[in-house]
UniProtKB/Swiss-Prot annotation:
Residues 191-263 form the GAR domain. This is GAS2-like protein 2B. The gene is gas2l2.S. SUPFAM superfamilies: Calponin-homology domain, CH-domain, GAS2 domain-like. Pfam families: CH, GAS2. PANTHER family: GAS2-LIKE PROTEIN 2B (PTHR46756:SF26), TRANSGELIN (PTHR46756). Disruption phenotype: Morpholino knockdown of both gas2l2.L and gas2l2.s resulted in mosiac embryos and impacted the number and distribution of basal bodies on the surface of ciliated cells. As a result, ciliary orientation was significantly reduced. Residues 332-353, 381-390 have a biased composition (Polar residues). Residues 859-868 have a biased composition (Basic and acidic residues). It comes from Xenopus laevis.
Amino acid sequence: MSTHQGGSVHSIRPFKSSEEYLYAMKEDLAEWLKDMYHLEIIVDNFIEILENGSVLCQHANNVTEVAREFFVQYPHLAEKLQLPKSGVKLNMMAQPGSFLARDNVSNFIQWCRKEMDIKDVIMFETEDLVHRKNEKNFLLCLLELARRASRFGMSAPMLIQMEEQIEEEIRQEMDLPPQEIPVPKPQRKLCDFKNLDQMVQNLVSRCTCPVQFSMVKVSEGKYRVGESSTLIFVRILRKHVMVRVGGGWDTLAHYLDKHDPCHCASLSHKPAIKLGSLQKQVSAVHEVKTQLTPRLDNPSKLETTLILSRSQSPLPPVEWRTYSAERTRTISSSYSLDDNENSPSFKNSQTPPNDRRSMSIGAHERSATLSRKLFTEDTQDPQQLGNPQSGHYRHHHSTSSLASQLTGSEEEYSYISEVFSESQSGRQMGKHTVMNLKEPPKRDAFLSHTQSANRKVISATQQNNIQQGLIIGHQSVTVQDSRPKTPSRFIQPPSPSKQIHFFYNQQNKGVEQNIKTQTNSCTRSSSPVKQTSLTYKQEFNKRPATPSRINYSSSQYKDGDKSAATEIITFHDHVRAKPSVSSEERTIRTGRATPTIHLNRENTNLPLKMQPKPNVTESSHSIERDCMYTPLPIDPEQEKQIYRSLEDEIRTNIKILEGDSEENNPENDTAAHDFNVLGKSTLRLSSSTSKTPRGQEGVPRSGVYINTAWQSGASYDDVITELTKGHVKLNNVDVENWISKIPLKGMVKEAHTSQRNKVRENGHTASLVRKKTLSTEMKGSKQKQLPSQIARQLALENKKKTVENVLEKQVSTVSGDSKEAIPEKIKLSQGLKPKKSLKKPERVPSIYKLKLRPKIRPRRDNRPEKKPSRIPTPVSYRQVPSRNNAKALKRTQSYQANKVSVAQTLNESQISAVNSEDLDSGDEICEHSAPLQAVETPITGENNQSRTEEEEESWV
């Protein structure tokens, strides 16, 4: 098999080979239609003339006429063929793109499927011709139609005639019988073969490969191609060399592109590389352009190299190698900034593709994972590799090579750390800025109060931080895992000393410069399981801790003399980021966003007084970023007053809770004890936060400010006493069932006579009971009441007095009525119920819009056929006044009876409510009195409404 792996420089065709055979078919069909229908059609306007469908429908009708003539002349042969029987309806005046044009094209498609039995594989749709897409199927459909029509005497294009000629040659070679239907056809002159072989050799000889694609001539127009010796038929169609492929045609140029490895750009047509013939493979590399390059074995001598420069060039060969750990380490450790020219990637980038491909054949072992990465390195530009800011060589260091460099001398690994810190400075500045921008803007207010003080200290202590970091950094860097690992793309900077130097330079630039230098790349450290010793720079890269996640441990943040919450929270991040001198330091990470805390075993074992205190001079620039808060304006004296008032109030509240829980509800001792413990803890916290260093007052953590003028005497006494009594029993009152609970006839008189006296007596007893309960509560509590509680009690008393006065007036009016009407009212009240009436809306919509039947009395009906009439006679309305008087009397009596019964039931409910000794009974009495007035108003309204209706009826 040939070993061609390239392509030619110049195209062997005037246009794309995939469209050349379509152009040849279109040219042949245009000439065929021009001769047959005398149309001015060429290749350029082929679609424009046929898109309205009229020419296609005419051609279909013409084929049908030829089929009918053939059936008349050759009836015995017509039985073996499928002939069309009907034509196509068409519209000659159809405009392109209109619905009439679409109808013409649709009729032609249906005729092809039904009458000519053309398969859907080579059929087209209406949209293909209207929108000029899928041109290939349109041309194939016309060729198939011409092929089928040529069987019964229809003139055919040149391609169909060449097909018939080739079929005749095959029949003669295979000694097959001749065609059964010798139908006379109008033939056209075919092209001769005198220039065919010359044109074929011209196309094939353009390949400059040492071993060319074989194409051997068997006879005129017949060749054997490739190593498989496939027999193909070649013909000349005007200016194109056509090849008979399967059931269709193709150009020779396109055929060579698909089958010749020199032209083919697909990986499926590439020959497999054999390990046994490596020496032959090197010399058989195919390129089109020649270039003199130095040889690999002897640079003084030059050799000719063929360089591939075609747009459809094949990809470099993919080599599958087995994994080798030693080779991985040598490849990954060989990339450095100083040895760029000596590295394999740099050499491969300078050598031409020919040498690079030949070099890659000799290697046998490579990791499957590294093949993709090293492939990108081979195709890298040399200038891009030389640039220290953008290159892939930094990302392919293995952990084993990094460990071997770290375990060397201090000079070597400090130099490497300097290189990495300088090359990754832009990334880390961008990362800090992005992390700061993502933080929430709202934080605790007291952290911002210390920000101004920290800024003053930072300028004086920056040099101290650098010196301490240099000393600590050299002692804390250790390598605990030197096992060979897979090459990691994300590198951990090894030297903390240079990082601190870079951190100091970064502080002076400011936050605004960091925002401008944002980059999309990020720096990640390796797993904390594999490498527990982290550097100062990596801790600085972490996300700042939120105040809610700070661990207030007594073993870490307690002072002997003075301890401030502001110092604890402000210097928490610095204690987290400070490297420890001890070798037992461990790093704890709970996630990406959680703070990292260093636990020192030696410090935790020491007593509280011996533990190291947080130093104010160790603040850094990261604290400024964490403490971006807006301070609240407050004086130190105001803070002292606030803390004192809070302490006094909490103490008094705890005492009140203890006293109330012992006297009233001994079951809640545990809850009171828990609240007492909580109060003591809050007292400790408030006392600790009240102490601030350097005479500065801190802001409370909760951010709540209480007025110092407030009296802290009895703040929770009434609330606690009310809650300790338990749930208060309330009386359920159903307003709707008042009328149904009317007493019997005999009890109405007794209730009417004794009603007035009972209300007065009950009112006096209720007031006495209320005064007694209030006095006992005031004596038992012996505490001052809040203004809101006093106002509430006064409001309740006023409500009760007003309700009593209203009830007395209502009862007096009821008793002042005539005693003669009472029996009649009682009789009427037992059988009557309040009339239901709907509330009239403000705007009544049209009856016909609501689709309701209008309930209006019909007018006079004078039609003679409608008898008797629906309109009542006016005589019946003359007796209305006598009826109206009776109706009015009955309604007034029922109204009086309902009023008496409602008042009686209301008094009973009031007496029961007063005896229950409920302080909130005034609210319920107001609720009782309100429905009474509401009941009165609808009745009077109904009475007036009924009168107006009767008056209107009498007027009619």
